[in-house]
Amino acid sequence: MGYTDQRFDVNLSILFTELPLLERPAAAAAAGFTAVELWWPWIDTATPEQSELDALKKALEDAGTQLVGLNFYAGQLPGPDRGAVSVPGEESERFRANIDIAADFAASVGCKALNALYGNRVEGVDPAIQDTLALENLVLAARAADRVGAILLIETLNKPESPLYPLVSAPSAIEVVDKVNEATGLGNAKFLLDIYHLSMNGEDVSQVIAEYAAKTGHVQIADNPGRGAPGTGELPLEQLLDELKKAGYDGWVGLEYKAADAAASFEWLPAEARPAS
């Protein structure tokens, strides 16, 4: 098995960021990749102009790259925010305004996975109120995703780097996944299994894979420590991806790591393994 048996995509919100957004798909293609993913690209607005959406679609198509994962609006990310789903007031309103825009854009480019970051705890707000709001918003997002034939992803982050984010263990994210599926009856809410975040939380990644592979809709990787490319840290990433394969996961593996020189950071992956089949 090994890396050559996986389907990798490049996260263009963390790699190739030295380039303007519309140049990044071509850079990923030049490095040999045919699949990419993105955080919400317009951090200052949940409702970009149609011309901006069209320009990104054209950049993806011109590069011959398939968008396989897209975040809903998530506030200032990169930045201090970790989503808007559970944040009362204007941020929740922005998220709701973004739902159909993100879903329709995903449909226009054939993207089948939409990620909704839960949002930080807000000082002075009862966590139960935030959780109720989150479920309401995630139900709306799941229905929109289903309308365009996509899944809704729920992600665990890590407590050291995101201390106000409440979903900092696999079970906490799975609980939300199950609640959304119970509320909608659609079954399209899935776990985003990020090996870097799980390891930063001190979780047994192999155990998480064994328990939750069947509920996993997308995987992301970076090595630890450092959040760099595979081989720069201490995680047995190739082994863990093999475990995912053996557990039945055959979806995408997003490369969501930091690198000063993105093109040079792919040396660990043979060129023939980069195009998605």
Give residue spans per PLM region.
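N-terminal small/glycine-rich loop or linker at the start of catalytic domains
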Residues: M1-L12, N71-S86, Y118-V122
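Histidine-acidic metal/acid-base catalytic patches
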Residues: M1-I14, E18-G32, G110-C111, I151, ...
